[in-house]
Regions:
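Pyridoxal 5′-phosphate
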Residues: 1-139
Length: 139
């Protein structure tokens, strides 16, 4: 089987419309600032939050913007773990370091019981019956 590259998170070229929106937003400055451009930035940020919430059919308070994928992974993994009654996490050794280190941190400091999925030499992750037991999250 030919390999399929799926790690476009940091390397996928931006679409023209996204680049234009980013360029426009990048001139707005600090959304926490009390000056005119800060207030415009805050309004743009909140409008984006509302638009995304509408698309996802959720409340705007549920939309969280982060500065990086690492921060997003950390918030998601810790949040799901802490919100769950289960202390079990399912992961693999080939996770992105941001996810892997967060899982290891929860195991070391918060009592998480990690079920490590086996990984073949070709990078295939084996699931087997691992998912038959409830878990706080699967990364």
């Amino acid at each position: 089987m030919a390999p399929v590259y799926l790690d476009h998170a940091a390397t996928t070229p931006m679409r023209d419309c996204a680049r234009e929106a980013w360029l426009e937003a990048s001139t707005l400055l600090n959304p926490g600032g009390q000056y005119a451009t800060g207030r415009r930035a805050r309004a743009a940020l909140e409008q984006a939050r509302e638009d995304i919430a509408s698309l996802l059919d959720c409340e705007s308070i549920e939309v969280i913007f982060t500065a990086s994928g690492t921060e997003a992974d950390n918030i998601a993994i810790q949040g799901l773990y802490r919100a769950s009654d289960s202390r079990r996490i399912v992961s693999s050794s080939i996770e992105h370091p941001a996810a892997l280190e967060t899982v290891r941190g929860l195991a070391a400091g918060a009592g998480a019981e990690v079920s490590w999925l086996p990984v073949s030499p070709s990078g295939m992750v084996g699931v087997g019956d691992t998912l038959d037991t409830p878990a706080a999250l699967v990364s």
